């Protein structure tokens, strides 16, 4: 099982926010072929890069130092690097609001929702869960934060009662209450210690969960407001034997799963809930991953997948793949020179 590490941790969120700067302009990119039945690979564009920054918080030496970074990967430049003087540990960057205020999650002060002003670097507690929820192991799968409800879903392993069942922890920061959501049923019990995945369909107010049961991927949907199970779709037949690593919905509510094989290929497939199959729409090779972070995650606006892949000890390749427009992509190479040791980096937050 994968749990939080307390070595050099790099909590990083790639919030590609529309921040204007003079040297860039928006443009179209060349398309890659895609269909619902065949894999597509990304194709780069020669047009100018979008005007977007990387926002990151580097946590060094067991939280002795937390560093705030703004990086422009398209110009290969560090815009800002400031030390944060905080009395809590940041475990996840959830969103960056239009005002550029950070909303972060911390478990060092119960389960807390906190805002950080990027100009003053001052923090403010929004709310915390009282009493704190205990009896779980925090998993490094992507969380889902529903900002308009102030609700956070975290994939966890529930160790209450001596078991190790994968579950979802629902943290409601409006009410200050936290609950476990049981995503398995009596016929398909989740494999002990397996890592669940979660996605939110804002259009229909559904939460989708996917978990492993006896080497099968089981899909479940429930109502976010009531937590009532809407449907247990059952086993996705054509991806048996693969571990799903991420799931997401697009703006129309279509559900996508991400999984990878041992050769470094990452597959994105769209779920057909009638046929109970997941049809391949995109493939990306991440190659060898000599570092301890996930090289892909979802954009904040649900428009793109972002891939960070290793080139050499001094450089990373950033590629933004727009799945709402035929999987067109933008790519650039940026330096990791702002890190002390990139091979000791761990990315906890994979929001965007």
UniProtKB/Swiss-Prot annotation:
Residues 25-49 are annotated as: Disordered. Residues 25-47 have a biased composition (Low complexity). It is found in: Secreted. Keywords: Glycoprotein, Secreted, Signal. The keyword Secreted applies. Residues 1-22 form the signal peptide. Glycans are attached at residues 76, 110, 182, 212, 223. One of its GO terms (cellular component) is extracellular region. This is Uncharacterized protein DDB_G0289171. It comes from Dictyostelium discoideum.
């Amino acid at each position: 099982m994968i749990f939080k590490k307390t070595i050099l941790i790099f909590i990083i969120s790639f919030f590609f926010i529309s921040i204007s700067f003079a040297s860039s302009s928006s443009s179209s990119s060349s398309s890659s072929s895609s269909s619902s039945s065949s894999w597509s690979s990304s194709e780069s564009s020669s047009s100018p890069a979008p005007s977007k920054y990387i926002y990151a918080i580097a946590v060094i030496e067991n939280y002795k130092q937390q560093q705030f970074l703004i990086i422009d990967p398209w110009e290969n430049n560090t815009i800002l690097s400031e030390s944060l003087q905080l009395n809590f540990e940041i475990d996840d960057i959830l969103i960056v609001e239009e005002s550029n205020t950070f909303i972060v999650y911390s478990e060092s002060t119960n389960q807390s929702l906190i805002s950080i002003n990027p100009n003053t670097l001052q923090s403010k507690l929004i709310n915390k869960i009282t009493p704190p929820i205990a009896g779980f192991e925090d998993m490094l799968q992507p969380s889902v934060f529903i900002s308009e409800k102030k609700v956070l879903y975290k994939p966890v392993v529930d160790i209450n009662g001596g078991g190790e069942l994968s579950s979802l922890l629902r943290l409601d920061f409006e009410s200050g209450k936290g609950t476990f959501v049981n995503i398995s049923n009596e016929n398909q019990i989740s494999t002990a210690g397996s890592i669940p995945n979660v996605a939110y369909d804002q259009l229909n107010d559904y939460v989708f969960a996917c978990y492993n049961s006896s080497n099968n991927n089981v899909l479940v949907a429930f109502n976010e407001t009531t937590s009532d199970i809407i449907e247990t779709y059952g086993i996705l037949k054509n991806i048996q034997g693969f571990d799903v690593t991420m799931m997401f919905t697009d703006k129309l509510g279509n559900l996508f799963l991400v999984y990878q094989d041992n050769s470094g290929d990452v597959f994105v497939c769209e779920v057909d809930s009638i046929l109970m199959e997941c049809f391949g729409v995109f493939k990306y090779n991440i190659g060898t991953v000599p570092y301890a972070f996930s090289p892909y995650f979802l954009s904040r606006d649900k428009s793109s997948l972002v891939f960070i892949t290793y080139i050499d000890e001094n450089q990373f390749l950033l590629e933004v793949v727009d799945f709402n427009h035929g999987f067109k992509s933008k790519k650039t190479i940026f330096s990791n020179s702002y890190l002390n040791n990139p091979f000791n980096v761990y990315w906890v937050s994979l929001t965007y």
